[in-house]
Amino acid sequence: MRFAYLATLAGSLLAGLAQAVKVNPLPAPQHIKWGESGPQYLDWNVKYSGPRDRTIIAAWRRTWGSIVQLRWTPAALEAPIPTFAPFIVGNGKRDAHSNRRILRVSVKVENTNVDLQHGVDESYTLQIRDKSDSIRITAKTTWGVLRAFTTLQQIVIFKRGRFLVEQPVDIKDYPLYPVRGIMIDTARNFISVKKIFEQLDGMALSKLNVLHWHITDTQSWPVEVRSYPQMTEDAYSRRETYGPSDIRKVIEYARARGIRVVPEIDMPGHSASGWRKIDPDIVACADSWWSNDDWEKHTAVQPNPGQLDIANNKTYKVVEKVYNDISRIFTDDWFHVGGDELQPNCFLTSKIVRDWLKQGSRTFNDLLQHWVDKTVPMMKKVKKNRRLLMWEDVLLSGNMHAHRVPRDIIMQSWNGGLANIKKLTARGYEVIVSSADFLYLDCGYGGWVGNDPRYNVMENPDPETPNFNYGGNGGSWCGPYKTWQRIYNYDFTDGLNYAEKKRVIGAIAPLWSEQADDVVISNKMWPRAAALAELVWSGNVGKDGKKRTTLMTQRILNFREYLVANGIMAAPLQPKYCLKHPHSCDLYYDQTVIM
């Protein structure tokens, strides 16, 4: 099936291309130098030579198995706009080393025992010398070797029944940021383990290394908790749950590909399903009408409402057991505990909260501080190296925010773009960027709440100005749709000083699942997530100081085809004509308009 797809994809690409074929991978390496000696063929069974490390050996088998199975040929190579001086094909030497073959991959690793945790070294070198019979890879850790393998996958192509790679090639590569990821939401709609594996495959190919797993929310509770098995009564069905064995499968699959899995249990907001099955008294406003038909009185930003009653002492005993049980399953040092979108009106439905606020003229900010003071020490003690993550709302929300949050807690910034990143880093916090205006992959698909009279408009009320149904966002609060160029061109450290830039530790692109499930998740995630992958691996600026968006275009179009060939149902970004005719679909002929 895949081979048939690739046969049609390859078409006539290499019919007249006996010259060198330099296929630049995605993400672009930090340093790559191609020679001009012509192609070198690879043996059909390139042997592994290196440490007897199970993770590396398994990764090599997957890598070479993929190369052999896919027999990949890109639909079109990187190319300058027509009439520009060519720079990607070689000097015309034809099959210069057809009598020589690459027989093995030689791997050297300084330390194969380094755990896959935050900050692990992922650097590598990959070298194929002129007329050599081996591919040489060096790395400081196992995880660097895995990154080298994914680069190798993309630079080997299939031509006339043989595998070839241009040589010599010398790559020295490492990531700009230690956190490079995507977020999946398995509460609004369930995502199967099989589809999670598919996202992990895409992540591995694009060198993303953190899967942020937003497991629970108000709508459903799909994860089994040993202390409270009744919580999954609020799953959508018995089959739409994750048991400990399911989670371990995801963790093992991810780890084999150099990907960390960071769980999120969103608290104290977005908390109704599951929790109410333990004790309805620990959940506030779950039975309220979420919008109250009057936005000033809303108890939630979307249906269904519910927040943990953080003035109720019983809440903390339950939270501790749930958190401890889930922490035992996940192996990463990090754990995300939410903290976003708390609604004061929800808390006001609780008599316990109202009585608490009356004592000493307390405020909602004091109430959230009470939650932070009670839960943070409890959550940190579970694991020696535990680090907590929270959404930025806990510090920056206009509704309610804590006065003090320990600075070792990592803040995930989703609102306010550059301004909020600046505020957080200036206060000394490490920050993960997830700005909705640039990185939310669910935006731009229109509204989803029902019984909405705003759509009942037959004539444009203001032809001169974009509005709800005519040129506006159509109910998508974070519209418009985030194109790959929007993502790729995001300079999220703009305006920060040196110290503040050092506190930005990476970026994660969320895909909230109000309108996503198994059927469409890969289509919405990919290949746009690959634009973020390059942004946080090697940046969006070339050695000449100019943005390389125009060079990225052909690589991401080819990468989309590569994802599909690997079983990842990525969406097309342009008509296929554009893929096969590089730059023919650019808005401007002038390739320097993006600086």
Swiss-Prot record:
Glycans are attached at N313. GO terms for molecular function: beta-N-acetylglucosaminidase activity. The keyword Hydrolase applies. Induction: Expression is induced by N-acetylglucosamine. One of its GO terms (cellular component) is membrane. Coiled coil: none annotated. GO terms for biological process: carbohydrate metabolic process; glycosaminoglycan metabolic process. Residues 1-20 form the signal peptide. Keywords: Glycoprotein, Glycosidase, Hydrolase, Signal. It catalyses: Hydrolysis of terminal non-reducing N-acetyl-D-hexosamine residues in N-acetyl-beta-D-hexosaminides. Its EC number is 3.2.1.52. It holds the Pfam family Glyco_hydro_20. It is an enzyme of class 3 (hydrolase). Belongs to the glycosyl hydrolase 20 family. Beta-hexosaminidase that shows a broad substrate specificity. PANTHER family: BETA-HEXOSAMINIDASE, BETA-N-ACETYLHEXOSAMINIDASE. This is Beta-hexosaminidase 1. It comes from Coccidioides posadasii (strain RMSCC 757 / Silveira) (Valley fever fungus). The lineage of its organism: Eukaryota, Fungi, Dikarya, Ascomycota, Pezizomycotina. The gene is HEX1.
